[in-house]
């Protein structure tokens, strides 16, 4: 039986649809991942999704919305405020506006992007204004807030009102400086013109050539120069006259003799720069030479002179502005402003805050200088102030030694020489009379104290000293009289070495030397004498100045006093006074 060849049955259909075949070329594609086997019904038993959700199963790990188009590898939250296009790592917590490279060696990762030192950072003006107001209200209620700290460290910018006031003050000072500069420039210019030497000196050797010399002088004056005629005497030579003219500062000198008059010529001497002498020049050529060199002289020397005048005027104007700023201008009232550093210390002192010793010394020194400046300005404004400069070292030393030696001359015990209240102000005549009577009483007490028994008891070892003290210069007595009490208190050593000038010995007034040691310091205390005259009083010092400057009578009294003190019986406390 012939049977037909059987055909093989068709192969089982591939369960993958179109495009899902196992193509090795497409399997290795980086774009398409490895194929996944899915059931025919499109649903996996372990997949609880709806069959209509066509998303990739890998997206199930990210609980995002289906419209979230970000990369599946970006695990940032939906609520992240950063831009979707920001490709930096999500662990980077920097500000999104910070585009600085972390690989930069100068990059500071701990520095805030909003730091005010960064030029990229600009704070808004309205926010800054409200912040400053809140900060001010907060700090005003703070009991520990230092309101003087931020005022001078420059951290807070000044307000618009203070800036406008500062600009107005600067403009006012600039106008005042210009005005003062013009005034000082004109004043110095007039002084320079008055002190400027003549431009040309015409030296006339013989008086017979006076008319010719005057004609030459007129031609020189027509060139714009100041001319002076000099007629030589028989005692003065021509070379000496030329030397005097050059020393006086004249740039030109023209010599006229009889030969010059005959030949209508002259000798021109140029003194400035390199000295030149042009002998027997014709008059016309001499005028051309003088005019040319005078222009050069004006260009060189007058320009330097103008610069010097401008420099002095500017310096004087600046000094005047500084003085007005310290004193305070007429629109600022009588009191001027203090320096910022001193003003802060004064404010702290006014608020009863703590100040160190150095800060207190700064305030004291500043106030002392300000007081001296005010007193100096007030004394300069007086019509006829009495100058205390003629009082040299000798008169000042005599004033120092006089009160300290007066209780010793009066023969009183030291405890009775306590300072009394200052006498009421009297007239200058009464003060002068008191001072003169004080000198007279000094001579009387010098004679009477030598006969007192208390001094006679200890006068034996001191007679040689009195003569030696009178022969010593006054500088020695001053230096020894101002010795410290630790040296003067050594009674035994002083007595063995021999008494020194100004150091009272052990037998004086019957008291030991250790008790008299503080008496040597009375030169600096300037006590009131027994006559009631306070030598610290300015009127008393003024009367003393008048007596010292005016008088033979005072010098006569002083000579009498020193003659009485030069005797061997004079006590040790009497000093020589040299005026």
Swiss-Prot record:
Cysteines paired by S-S bonds: none
Mutagenesis or variant effect for residue 342 to A: Abolishes E2-inducible strong interaction with ESR1, but not basal interaction
Gene3D superfamilies from the UniProt entry: Anticodon-binding domain (3.40.50.800)
Sequence motif LXXLL motif, residues: 345-349
Location of this chain's protein in the cell: Nucleus
Highest taxon in the source lineage: Eukaryota
Tissue expression per record: Widely expressed.
GO biological process, one term: glucose homeostasis
A single MF term (Gene Ontology): transcription corepressor activity
Biased composition (Low complexity): 446-457
Record field: compositional bias (Basic and acidic residues): 11-62, 68-78, 164-173
Biased composition annotated in UniProt, kind: Polar residues: 395-413, 459-485, 520-537
Chain intervals for the UniProt region annotation (Transcription repression): 1-158
Phosphothreonine carried by residues: 3, 274, 379
CC per GO annotation: actin cytoskeleton; extracellular space; nucleoplasm
Keyword Transcription regulation tagged: yes
Residues found modified as Phosphoserine: 9, 21, 24, 29, 34, 96, 116, 126, 143, 151, 378, 381
Sequence positions bearing N-acetylmethionine: 1
Domains (record comment): Contains one Leu-Xaa-Xaa-Leu-Leu (LxxLL) motif that is essential for the association with nuclear receptors.
Quaternary structure annotation from Swiss-Prot or TrEMBL: Binds HTATIP2/TIP30. Interacts with YLPM1. Forms a complex with ILF2, ILF3, YLPM1, KHDRBS1, RBMX and PPP1CA.
PANTHER family reported in the protein's UniProt record: NUCLEAR RECEPTOR COACTIVATOR 5 (PTHR23295:SF3), NUCLEAR RECEPTOR COACTIVATOR 5-RELATED (PTHR23295)
Protein name as catalogued: Nuclear receptor coactivator 5
